């Protein structure tokens, strides 16, 4: 496992997020406001100039190795054929840190990070952590190699996150205000150079990711093949000097971006002489330097028609939208779509999405500032939250011991158990007395006691176990809610919006893991049910016996002369039931004493509750932790 930087409150002051995209690269910086509660934090995200001279935040993912250094972005095109030549759109899933493609990517990472340090003078060697994004769908092995590549490039890496998750995080921030849609169910639509990725989110579902090979480079290639190479001279040039194809495709991309950034009725002219991309000392310069590459459209409709007729891109995009809707998220509610990636500005994207998901156009949102910066901003914001949350988790774990007070919990559980047992036990006494009054044969104490004894045995077999289980269930539910509230008091200070949500039912999360922690309690519960049941009759009769002599000792013949047997039984039963408060008070003391002196019960229950709530807290902490890889 790569050695990632561990956040240090005394050392790190800044988070840098870098999006090494397939087509373009951007970076953002965010200060870590350690000493401030959430309500006091400003959480400023600043975009970093990666082309310092031109003050450009986004550069083309291009690299050219030249003698004496490495050039990236637009500068790379000034040395098209030097040494190994220019490379664009070279990012790919890594397979070996020693591979040629991986070494090229390491060089690019190193050069971009150097630009970050040059642009942001406040950064020192030790006062910041960098987080980077990676495409969805990479294997754990590929992620590990990518981490190692970043570290090899000299980047102080805090971890990776998926591009879609970074976009989601930014979409939920106040900068975009898309959190409401996400809570009800929404999609993040990430159109990159190589792939189109969808992520469905809602508060009630795990994220659903899926990608399609519909990156915007398809359109770059269409412009290259059907507009540039339409000229015979250009076609011959590319056949004779294929090393220039990447440079020409870069120009095609720039033309596409320029066209879709304009009003749809505006013309776009992006032609240039080949001399702009051919080095002066190349043999091809004299022959082709003056050849003009024609790039011109009257309006976007003309460009869209060419794209559709040659690539069927819009039809394929529509099919991908339908496939995701019907096969990946069937019956899911879609309340909005958030677009990210520079290519999402193309004018046919939003209407297609709105039509497919039956949404008003204003529910298909785009970061109008610059969608090319969405991922890097999201990474920086997510990284800053990660380091703050890492401190929060440490505080919460220290808090566990105080959240789980064994003695208090046991006392509360016993109180709840005793009250429920007494209430339902007295119902047995009451219902038995009523039956005896109506159907008794005598007015003798022994007859009533026999009936009560029989009914208590039924109560033992059929009711006590359920009482204990129900009491335990409600106790766990209430205690879990108390713990949740105490945890949220801490969470809201550090990471508002990540509080553990309240639930009507006990959400056990990993049910098997938690149930295993309660297994020790099962035996003790069974034993205590038997213990309570077996002694319950004696406990009640000991409590009632104090009052029985006075009730049953009067001469039988006096009552017989004055009243019927049923009337006498009713009088005696009323006398007994009238002693409810005194009897139940005595029973309460006796049952608590029985439970209190049962060491096995006390030990197994306290141990099991501690294990249960420790695991429950840990599972809830996993919901708070930012998913950094």
Predicted regions and their residues:
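Glycine-rich phosphate-binding/hydrolytic loop that grips phosphoryl groups
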Residues: 163-175, 220-221, 365-405
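Gly/charged contiguous loops adjacent to phosphate- or pyrophosphate-bearing nucleotide/cofactor binding elements
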Residues: 74-84, 218-351, 409, 414-522, ...
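Glycine-rich phosphate-binding loops at beta-strand->alpha-helix junctions
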Residues: 130-145, 331-353, 367-371
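Hydrophobic, small-residue-rich alpha-helical packing segments that form membrane-like cores
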Residues: 120, 146-185, 219-220
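Extended, charge-rich low-complexity interaction segments
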Residues: 185-202, 387-421
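Gly/Thr-rich phosphate-binding beta-strand-loop-beta motif of the actin/hexokinase/Hsp70
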Residues: 3-38, 175-207, 379
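Phosphate/ATP-binding catalytic cores across multiple sugar-kinase/actin-like superfamilies
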Residues: 1-7, 11, 105-123, 164-179, ...
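Phosphate-binding loop and its immediate beta->loop->alpha context
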Residues: 33-35, 39-153, 222-223, 228-273
